Amino acid sequence: MKESMSKTRVAINGFGRIGRTILRILLLSDTDIEIVAINDLGDYQTLAYLLKYDTVFGVLKEDVRIENKKLIVGNNGYNIKLISERDPSLIPWKELDIDIVIEATGAFANRESLEQHINAGAGKVILTVPPKDEIDATIVLGVNEEVLDGSMQLISNASCTTNCLAPI
């Protein structure tokens, strides 16, 4: 991770429903997180369209366009590199100086596949689905977030079902 004064550099692997929702939340938040890159195999124009026109969240107010393999959102400099790489071990996380990869494809959910992001240069991986085998931690906010520490590299935020039931 970077010094406390710099932003945390994050990449999203998988720009489906979860990946797009994460980006929308971060766009609307005042946070020290910088979305640096998105890796998805879809057509870039289609990805931009799906971000702009969401059936659940509605139309994103900011302008969304593709320029030179970058997703440009708004006029304030959201300039996100787009990558289309099927193999996580070949994604240039080290070159991009990525602190955290948000793994949102659903395809990589075991320790071995998640470690490919670490081997490619990412500092940590947050899995958006339940893991298929043992990783460093599965965290449910409001239940066990106190076990999370900075040494953990592979964590999961459980599942949408688990998180919706946690407050009960």
Where are the predicted features?
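N-terminal Rossmann-like NAD(P) cofactor-binding subdomain of oxidoreductases
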Residues: 2-168
